[in-house]
């Protein structure tokens, strides 16, 4: 089964341009995470209530992010690079099939970066990708659309909804399956 064009079209022109130019996984992932996470120099609570900063980091220099924490742009760039490299290394260690650069970026965003390794290891996605079922793995990414038990598909257009999670899963799936239909 080929990836539906509508999923590929959900990626930004910037991300698609990087892929078509042959960019590395770190470059693709940086662009994608900048688009999805933003980059806050001031600590804020994420959707789960955790204090985070930069592109969602919960720790800086081994210390937890706390209310009122502020960082410079330069420091956030360092934190973001460290987090990016950490999740890409996780993909290299834990995904047993060969991957293209966009596929590495998609998996890194979904598994270690967004849902966390603890939820990833027992997931259908993880089992399918490592069994070589790439289409099945990409389908399984799109199942992760609940936030606190709430189905995010039902929140489109709502203030304080979580519909962005549905879009993100579609985009992560598109990256993870980039090129398998060729």
Name these PLM-found stretches.
Residues 2-15, 19, 26-48, 60, ...:
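Long, amphipathic alpha-helical surface segments
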Residues 47, 52-61, 81-84, 88, ...:
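Secreted/periplasmic proteins that engage bacterial cell-wall peptidoglycan
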Residues 33, 53, 107:
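Short, conserved catalytic/metal-binding motifs centered on acidic residues
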Residues 69-123:
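Mid-length scaffold segments of soluble, non-membrane domains
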Residues 55-73:
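Acidic/histidine-rich, surface-exposed loop or edge segments in extracytoplasmic proteins
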């Amino acid at each position: 089964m080929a990836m539906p064009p509508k999923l590929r079209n959900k990626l930004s022109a910037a991300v698609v341009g990087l892929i078509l130019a042959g960019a590395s996984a770190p470059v693709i992932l940086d662009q994608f995470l900048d688009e999805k996470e933003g980059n806050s120099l001031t600590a804020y609570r994420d959707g789960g209530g955790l204090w985070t900063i930069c592109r969602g980091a919960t720790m800086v220099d081994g210390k937890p992010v706390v209310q009122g924490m502020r960082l410079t742009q330069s420091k956030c760039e360092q934190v973001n690079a460290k987090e990016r490299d950490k999740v890409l290394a996780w993909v290299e260690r834990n995904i047993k099939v060969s991957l293209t650069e966009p596929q590495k970026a998609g998996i890194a965003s979904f598994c270690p970066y967004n849902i966390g390794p603890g939820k990833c290891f027992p997931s259908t996605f993880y089992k399918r990708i490592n069994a070589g079922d790439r289409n099945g793995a990409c389908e399984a990414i799109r199942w992760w659309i609940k936030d606190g038990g709430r189905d995010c598909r039902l929140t489109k257009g709502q203030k304080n909804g979580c519909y962005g999670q549905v879009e993100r899963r579609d985009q992560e799936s598109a990256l993870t399956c980039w090129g398998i239909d060729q």
